[in-house]
């Protein structure tokens, strides 16, 4: 259809009224799995979510939140908050980060793009630096993509390459870092055999070095900057394998929190600081934990920490991490073009919207929900509230996080009568689940359940509707499992804790006094996923969804 014919106007739903206040609650990292001692959601007291489950199959069901249902390449790809909120907000399935990069590398298109040609101008005389998470976790990055980019860059004239690694232990097992570093060292040795000066220059654990997000703790980025750009770190080693093995021997060491190190030559000099004229690529395809480093690498005006030096480099991201900020300005692979999101449609149809979370997930209910777009669609129709997250501690120390404060903001917004949709993300089960602390995660799940109750109580008072769902699994299975599904043990006979997301489906529940009698979940979409939620919510606001949206999960039957 030509652009002249396009209209934001949504058709009225034939059976569902407008004007009901709707609460949209996303429980982060809350999947559905069998009941056992490692299912923190099962172990926790969660009376509200338990009572919603009694509404199955008409008012409660499971939906898919991983793999192809959210645009990821395979059914073995765990969902994550970014792609989950994209799907929830967009109402359609878009090829996502990892998939886009795979396609660009497979076809070789990545090497023809503006981004690669821009960094290539440094190859002849300077160094190519690659910075990113080293694992095959597939949430932020993947080792095989780094391997292909190394090979492709060397074939296209890169003579000197330095890799700045960040160890994982969050999306993959703790302790797996050594194997990944050994694999990479082997690849770099093969490049050296072909005359390319290629080596690892620095490293550190992802949660302590570089990969902070939402400006929670700039010291994390500074530690990375000092090692990567300045070539300075508290630990110096002759090679990265020795570095990771040695640093892991500290009593409480783990891959996520390894301290920063630099690799030095025989004379003790760092082998790969970033200097004027060099090219830099940040390898991660997921945006949230690269944005802060991207700002430090790109912004002339920068006051978050003392950079000491601000080298004149050619910098490109694997993808553009923030479309609104145009950050970074250059990138190797174009992001998914997400347009006509449900949020934009709804404000154009008079739905006044309130969105709230705490810092660690605020971007998810706003930026990612709105198709990777910062800011408001219509400022007079929308209000976004960010509650500052605790900083300087790991989330298992305060597992209740800001669930109560988020619920209070949502309650006040619902009772104010100023909003038609009140949307929140409750981060507890995900953020605390990532710490691997089972007891704390149980506390986190209970806190999230209490927050849901407060929001539902407010909806009851105003005669509204609630939709409760999640973006992916995490807290429902905290143990690594063998092929038979039994808890896996390490060599000392201890249970191997799982800190990552899962492949489990997530619940969705609907209800509230404003729900029209006869509304129930359809039984003809058994493989429904997160992308089906947008049309469902549009229906509950009294509108038909656009024809190209994934179909609604609900129907209205006459009693």
Swiss-Prot record:
Pfam families: iPGM_N (PF06415), Metalloenzyme (PF01676). One of its GO terms (cellular component) is cytoplasm. Its cofactor is Mn(2+). It is found in: Cytoplasm. Keywords: Cytoplasm, Glycolysis, Isomerase, Manganese, Metal-binding, Stress response. Substrate binds at residues 140, 170-171, 206, 213, 286-289, 361. Induction: By salt stress. It catalyses: (2R)-2-phosphoglycerate = (2R)-3-phosphoglycerate. Mn(2+) 1 binds at residues 430, 434, 501. InterPro entries: Alkaline_phosphatase_core_sf (IPR017850), BPG-indep_PGM_N (IPR011258), Metalloenzyme (IPR006124), PGAM_B_sf (IPR036646), Pgm_bpd_ind (IPR005995). It is an enzyme of class 5 (isomerase). Its main location: cytoplasm. SUPFAM superfamilies: 2,3-Bisphosphoglycerate-independent phosphoglycerate mutase, substrate-binding domain, Alkaline phosphatase-like. Pathway: Carbohydrate degradation; glycolysis; pyruvate from D-glyceraldehyde 3-phosphate: step 3/5. Mn(2+) 2 binds at residues 28, 81, 471-472. Disulfide bonds: none annotated. NCBIfam families: pgm_bpd_ind. This is 2,3-bisphosphoglycerate-independent phosphoglycerate mutase. The gene is PGM1.
């Amino acid at each position: 259809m030509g652009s002249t014919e396009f209209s934001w106007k949504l058709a009225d739903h034939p059976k569902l009224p407008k004007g009901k206040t709707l609460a949209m609650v996303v429980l982060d990292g809350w999947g559905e799995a069998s009941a056992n001692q490692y299912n923190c959601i099962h172990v926790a007291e969660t009376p509200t979510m338990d009572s919603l489950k009694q509404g199955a199959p008409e008012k409660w069901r499971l939906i898919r939140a991983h793999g192809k249902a959210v645009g990821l390449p395979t059914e073995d790809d765990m969902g994550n908050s970014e792609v989950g909120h994209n799907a929830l907000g967009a109402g359609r399935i878009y090829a996502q980060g990892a998939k886009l990069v795979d396609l660009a590398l497979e076809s070789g298109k990545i090497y023809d793009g503006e981004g690669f040609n821009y960094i290539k101008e440094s190859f002849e005389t300077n160094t190519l630096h690659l910075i990113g998470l080293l694992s095959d976790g597939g949430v932020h990055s993947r080792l095989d993509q780094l391997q292909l980019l190394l090979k492709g860059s060397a074939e296209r004239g890169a003579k000197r390459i330095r890799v700045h690694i960040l160890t994982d232990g969050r999306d993959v097992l703790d302790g797996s870092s050594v194997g990944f570093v050994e694999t990479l060292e082997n690849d770099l040795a093969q490049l050296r055999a072909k005359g390319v000066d290629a080596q690892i220059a620095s490293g550190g654990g992802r949660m302590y070095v570089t990969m902070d997000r939402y400006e929670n703790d700039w010291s994390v980025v500074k530690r990375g900057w000092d090692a990567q750009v300045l070539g300075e770190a508290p630990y110096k080693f002759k090679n990265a394998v020795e570095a990771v093995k040695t640093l892991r021997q500290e009593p409480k060491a783990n891959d996520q929190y390894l301290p920063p190190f630099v690799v030095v030559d025989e004379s003790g000099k760092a082998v790969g600081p970033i200097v004027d004229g060099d090219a830099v690529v940040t390898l991660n395809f997921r945006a949230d934990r690269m944005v802060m480093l991207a700002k430090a690498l790109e912004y002339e005006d920068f006051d978050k920490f003392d950079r000491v030096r601000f080298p004149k480099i050619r910098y490109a991201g694997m993808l553009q991490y923030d479309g609104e900020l145009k950050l970074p300005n250059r990138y190797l692979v174009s992001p998914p073009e997400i347009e006509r999101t449900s949020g934009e449609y709804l404000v154009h149809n008079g739905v006044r919207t309130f969105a709230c979370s705490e810092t660690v997930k605020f971007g998810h209910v706003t930026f990612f929900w709105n198709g990777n777009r910062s800011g408001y669609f219509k400022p007079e129709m929308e209000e976004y509230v960010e509650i500052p997250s605790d900083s300087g501690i790991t989330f298992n120390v305060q597992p209740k996080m800001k669930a109560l404060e988020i619920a209070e903001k949502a309650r006040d917004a619902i009772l104010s009568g100023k909003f038609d949709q009140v949307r929140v993300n409750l981060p507890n089960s995900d953020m605390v689940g990532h710490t691997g602390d089972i007891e704390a995660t149980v506390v986190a799940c209970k806190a999230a359940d209490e927050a849901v109750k407060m929001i539902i109580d407010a909806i009851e008072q105003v005669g509204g509707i609630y939709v409760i769902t999640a973006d992916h699994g995490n807290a429902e299975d905290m143990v690594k499992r063998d092929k038979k599904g039994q808890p896996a043990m390490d060599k000392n006979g201890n249970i191997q804790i799982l800190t990552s997301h899962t492949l489990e489906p997530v619940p969705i529940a609907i209800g509230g006094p404003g729900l029209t009698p006869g509304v129930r979940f359809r039984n003809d979409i058994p493989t429904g996923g997160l992308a089906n939620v947008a049309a469902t919510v549009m229906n509950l606001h009294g509108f038909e969804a656009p024809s190209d949206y994934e179909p609604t999960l609900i129907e209205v039957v006459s009693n």
